[in-house]
Amino acid sequence: MYGVVNLKRWLQTAATAVLAVGAIGVFGALLTVFAADGGVQVPVIMYHAVIDDSRRLGQYVVSPAELESDFAWLQRNGYTAVLSEDLIRYVEDGTPLPEKPVLITFDDGYYNNYLYAYPAARRYGMKFVLSPIGKCTDLYTAEPSESPYYAHCTWAMLREMQDSGIVEIGNHTYDLHSSDGARLGTRRLASESMEDYRAMLSADVRLAQEKAGQNLGRAPVLFAYPFGVVSEGEPEIIASLGFSVTLSCEARISTVTRDPESLLYLGRFLRPSGETSEAFFARTLGAV
């Protein structure tokens, strides 16, 4: 039955393509339809902090105005923000994705995401994935701060955003987000046995899952690798903990197919400050 539905959808799409380009361009249009049937290209945009202070802007910090401009550009150009559940449904049972899907992500769980990104997403009809560092969420839940410069979201803020239906909470480890110690992110140490590494990584990520379950009512299905670092054997460990979607920091567009493995290590484009929305999306999304 599914094959019949797919064939019907393909024929309808092909007919539309023929009408759109005329007889001269029929062959090229049909090739495009064949390519589209092999999966869906899903660009992923990666943000971190959003701060309304020109002195703080840089590679990992954009201004509220830049973020709103990005959301407006995506809306104006026909993109629809999706979440993990949309990708999983497409892979598992063929539920169609929007014509131009985009996955918007925020790493680390800063309070300024709640302050600026959350209301902006509501205004522009966007959705996004926010992947907090579990330990930071615990710290700022115990001692809340509303400083847009350094504070992180509390569990209550994450719950509010999640319950709105436009924000998905991911896992960014509990306490493996350091770049100034012996271990970079989740990287395995040279002196560490695979058995010890598996135990360490599993304990940390599982703790973040448990904290989310206790405070949000559900455990994340998406894992964002800190710094994009992945050690040998790590993907298997992460998969064993129940994640269906994982995010890298590689600048590329991923093609999502009916193969569950197509949801692993999705490419992402880091959004820096100092570039117009038009220039950034032309550079990263191209013709997608």
Model segments located where?
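Extended hydrophobic/aromatic segments used for targeting, binding, or gating
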Residues: 235-272
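N-terminal Lys/Arg-rich, disordered targeting/topogenic segments
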Residues: 1-9
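Metal-dependent polysaccharide deacetylase catalytic core of the NodB/CE4 family, i.e.
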Residues: 45, 49-51, 57, 100-102, ...
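Active-site environment of divalent metal-dependent phosphoester hydrolases
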Residues: 111-113, 176-178, 227-233, 253-256
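Extracytoplasmic/secreted proteins, especially bacterial periplasmic and envelope-associated proteins
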Residues: 65-69, 73-76, 82, 86, ...
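N-terminal pre-catalytic segment of deacetylase/amide-hydrolase enzymes
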Residues: 12-102, 264, 268-273, 288
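Alpha-helical scaffolding within the catalytic cores
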Residues: 87-90, 113-117, 145-165, 251-255
